[in-house]
């Protein structure tokens, strides 16, 4: 019997896959537990419609990430921090501080986990911070840390 998997089933199939399984297994386990549905014409067309919708959403997400990349690369985020001799900061500027300043100054919301800044910024001046917006799109945000008066 052909079924369409609604969820991943270990050893049998992944979500959205159409596979042939034993009739008893399909009726008594997969369909009963809501893990799969019978692969008839209406269910297959619904699956194709779902795949088309997901593809359109993925393309829209990629376009949105590309436009955000263009915007971010034109900006410079200005932050001030206390520093000692030689331009070394007391503490560091974290990704959270950068995203909050970006939200406050430019009204652009970016998740702090998308900034690839493992140790924070520990010196005055300009720093290029990579921002992973999408698996295929990475922007570079310019951050300027000034000495606090």
Curated annotation (Swiss-Prot):
One of its GO terms (cellular component) is cytosolic large ribosomal subunit. It comes from the Bacteria. Belongs to the bacterial ribosomal protein bL9 family. Transmembrane segments: none annotated. GO terms for molecular function: rRNA binding; structural constituent of ribosome. Pfam families: Ribosomal_L9_C, Ribosomal_L9_N. Keywords: Ribonucleoprotein, Ribosomal protein, RNA-binding, rRNA-binding. It comes from Bacillus subtilis (strain 168). SUPFAM superfamilies: L9 N-domain-like (SSF55658), Ribosomal protein L9 C-domain (SSF55653). InterPro entries: Ribosomal_bL9, Ribosomal_bL9/RNase_H1_N, Ribosomal_bL9_bac/chp, Ribosomal_bL9_C, Ribosomal_bL9_C_sf, Ribosomal_bL9_N, Ribosomal_bL9_N_sf. One of its GO terms (biological process) is translation. Binds to the 23S rRNA. This is Large ribosomal subunit protein bL9.
């Amino acid at each position: 019997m052909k079924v369409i998997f609604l969820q991943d089933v270990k050893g049998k199939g992944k979500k959205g896959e159409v596979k042939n399984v034993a009739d008893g297994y399909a009726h008594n386990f997969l369909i009963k537990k809501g893990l799969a549905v019978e692969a008839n014409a209406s269910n297959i067309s619904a699956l194709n419609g779902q795949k088309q919708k997901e593809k359109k959403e993925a393309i829209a997400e990629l376009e949105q990430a590309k436009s955000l990349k263009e915007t971010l690369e034109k900006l410079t985020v200005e932050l001030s921090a206390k520093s000692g001799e030689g331009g070394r900061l007391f503490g560091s500027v974290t990704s959270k501080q950068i995203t909050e300043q970006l939200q406050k100054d430019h009204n652009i919301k970016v998740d702090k986990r998308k900034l690839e800044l493992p140790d924070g910024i520990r010196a005055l001046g300009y720093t290029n911070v990579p921002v992973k917006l999408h698996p295929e799109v990475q922007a570079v945000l310019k951050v300027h840390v000034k000495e606090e008066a």
